[in-house]
Amino acid sequence: MSVCDHQRRWVTLAACLMLWLSGVAFAAKPVRHDVLIDMFIWWNAAYKEKDGFTEAAFGKYFTPDAVLRVNGSDRSKGLADLASHFRDIQARTEMVEIELPFIDEFTSASGDRIFTHHFVKAREKGQASRERVMGYAAIRDGKISMINFVSVPDAAAK
């Protein structure tokens, strides 16, 4: 085997190694987690449990004075109200799921707001629906102090 043949083999081997390593690096990209994603993962699981929505459980993710605002209307204020609000939703629906991963998500430069674009699917009285949700969660001391979302029916779901 000539020197040129050895060089070609090494170049080919090096190129294959580089491609393999780039694939490993891409596949090993860590999944992003923050308090909003962690809360929605918990929320999806809690919805399926009879006593999943408790004040204490919400307290792991929300500040005591947290506000849930949807389409400009305050739906709940405080941990007890959040738990009650979502127990009511749980009681009147057959299924609700926040679709993960989000379509898009980013954190403000100051780190105090997490912006998201995602879907929520549900079934109530046998009728399936899907909402497109956009907005932000305000973060204080590592917890959600406010969720401010705009939610509209997803036209593609019809």
Predicted feature locations:
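Short hydrophobic/aromatic-rich beta-strand segments that constitute the beta-sheet cores
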Residues: L68-V70, T116, M146-I147
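Short, low-complexity N-terminal intrinsically disordered segments enriched in polar/charged residues
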Residues: C4, L13-P64, K158
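Generic short beta-strand segments
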Residues: D65, H117-R123
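N-terminal secretory signal peptides that target proteins for export/translocation
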Residues: M1-Q7
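A solvent-exposed, acidic/Ser-Thr-rich amphipathic alpha-helical stretch
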Residues: H33, E55-T107, D112, Q127
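Short beta-strand edge/turn micro-motifs at domain boundaries
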Residues: R130-K158
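Hydrophobic/aromatic beta-strand elements that line small-molecule binding cavities or substrate pockets
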Residues: F86, L100-F106, F119-K121, R132-A138
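A mature extracytoplasmic/lumenal domain signature
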Residues: G72, H118-V120, S151
